[in-house]
């Protein structure tokens, strides 16, 4: 094969692009990955910050569901430390969830709280209709396409209990990147069946970036990985992608290929390939489905574990807070992410709306109020290491996980991968690598290496 010619060019080194590139390189396709930054991994990379190893986006990863399988298929080892314990903080108290039946237990807690409250104030005892909710839940999981309302409206059919609504809003916001009053119920139910709640998750002991480099290494065995080399154009000839222009140093290089896989996001892909090459129908779908969401990522450093105080490995979901909906004590799970004698905790903060630009100053203020209230030892033993607001126009802002874009584009031989191409019910890095696997399979079936 000629220099400057590859079977596949992958634009961007997120986990979707890395997965597709590694699978194809392993299958004999000469592959080039171009990354505009100096760091591999996208939102699955690792940032060195004041001696700490912090994730650039994704914190906990799912075991299986495409990630583990991809590493196995390319001959690399995926190293992950599982987190066996899950807690919910409800009404100021921490409840540990069983390995199975977490939803049932959560509704039982809500029922008991409602009964106890009614006993205190007198009057008719009214529980939160837990069994009725679970029955409707099972039915809706089996037929999610029939649910046309928001998840909050679906739940209101069975209860107006505020605590129950807070719990489900926390789940929707943390996992699906949308409040229960924003997200369609049809996008929520498939997640429970496909991803099994929050139990099969863990942290990579050496940081996500370390694991992403393993996939990049596979690509290098049958191709190249260029960092600090942004793609400036996707070359389209007669409706077909035939390569890319890449800025490498002070010059622009043309690279020819059979296939172009873009992990740059659909909007950037359209910009690189030229909007005139995309149908109005595709552009309409993109405008409707591609909705970057705002979020605040917070990291707290401390001299001792702030939660759990015994330093055990766990994840906590929080209901009824101002903004913080989940906490992960990273160094209790993966000690290497903090310097010796230090600890670091991650907190995910959900803005009031995932659909519009957030007021960054106000969201940071509310997040800090939550952190100082939720972590009593923070003022004495810790400090807020970093709070990063990512608004809808931030370079690393993800799209919501409601309804994904197709991998195929109107341009032949051009495919999109990443968290905007999520299958229904699969979110985050798991959904992104799933898109990479699907793209790799399309290439395997339609193109021959070295052709």
Please tell me what each predicted stretch does.
Residues 26-49:
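Glycine-rich FAD pyrophosphate-binding loop
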Residues 232-342:
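Mid-domain catalytic core of redox enzymes
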Residues 6-33:
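N-terminal Rossmann-like FAD-binding beta1-loop-alpha1 element of flavoenzymes
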Residues 191-249:
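Helical element adjacent to the flavin cofactor pocket in flavoenzyme catalytic cores
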Residues 327-451:
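Conserved flavin/dinucleotide-binding core of flavoenzymes
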Residues 50-125:
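Dinucleotide-binding Rossmann-like beta1-alpha1 core, especially the glycine-rich loop
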Residues 93-94, 107-189:
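Rossmann-like flavin
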Residues 16, 39, 267:
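Conserved Rossmann-like nucleotide-cofactor binding loop
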């Amino acid at each position: 094969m000629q220099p400057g010619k590859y079977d596949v060019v992958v634009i961007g080194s997120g986990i979707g692009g890395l997965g597709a590139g590694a699978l194809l390189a392993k299958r004999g396709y000469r592959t080039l990955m171009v990354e505009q930054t100096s760091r591999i991994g996208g939102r699955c990379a690792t940032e060195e910050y004041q001696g700490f190893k912090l994730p650039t986006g994704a914190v906990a990863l799912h075991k299986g569901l495409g990630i583990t399988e991809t590493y196995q298929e390319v001959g690399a080892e995926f190293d992950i430390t599982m987190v066996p314990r899950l807690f919910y903080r409800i009404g100021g108290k921490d409840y540990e969830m069983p390995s199975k039946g977490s939803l049932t237990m959560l509704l039982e807690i809500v029922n008991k709280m409602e009964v106890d409250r009614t006993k205190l104030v007198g009057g008719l005892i009214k529980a939160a209709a837990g069994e009725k909710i679970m029955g409707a839940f099972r039915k809706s999981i089996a037929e999610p396409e029939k649910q046309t309302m928001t998840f909050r409206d679906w739940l209101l059919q069975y209860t107006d209990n505020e605590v129950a609504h807070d719990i489900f809003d926390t789940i929707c916001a943390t996992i699906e990147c949308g409040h229960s009053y924003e997200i369609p119920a049809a996008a929520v139910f498939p997640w429970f069946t496909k991803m099994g709640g929050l139990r099969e998750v863990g942290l990579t002991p050496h940081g996500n970036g370390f694991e992403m480099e393993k996939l990049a290494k596979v690509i290098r065995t049958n191709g190249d990985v260029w960092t600090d080399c942004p793609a400036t154009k996707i070359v389209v000839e007669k409706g077909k992608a035939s390569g890319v222009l890449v800025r490498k140093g002070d010059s622009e290089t043309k690279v020819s290929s059979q296939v172009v896989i873009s992990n740059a996001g659909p909007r950037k892909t359209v910009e690189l390939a030229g909007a005139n090459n995309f149908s109005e129908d595709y552009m309409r779908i993109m405008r409707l489905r591609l909705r970057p969401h705002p979020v605040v990522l917070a990291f707290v450093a401390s001299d001792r574990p702030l939660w759990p105080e015994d330093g055990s490995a766990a994840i906590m979901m929080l209901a009824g807070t101002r903004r913080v909906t989940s906490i992960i004590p990273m160094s209790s799970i993966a000690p290497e992410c903090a310097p010796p004698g230090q600890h670091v905790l991650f907190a995910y903060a959900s803005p009031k709306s995932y659909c519009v630009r957030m007021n960054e100053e106000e969201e940071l203020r509310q997040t800090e109020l939550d952190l100082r209230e939720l972590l009593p030892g923070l003022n004495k033993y810790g400090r807020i290491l970093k709070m990063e607001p990512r608004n809808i126009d931030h370079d690393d802002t993800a799209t919501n996980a409601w309804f994904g874009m197709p991998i195929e584009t109107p341009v032949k031989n051009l495919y999109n991968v990443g968290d905007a191409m999520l299958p229904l019910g699969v979110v985050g890095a798991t959904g992104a690598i799933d898109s990479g696997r699907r793209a790799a399979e399309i290439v395997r079936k339609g193109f021959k290496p070295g052709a």
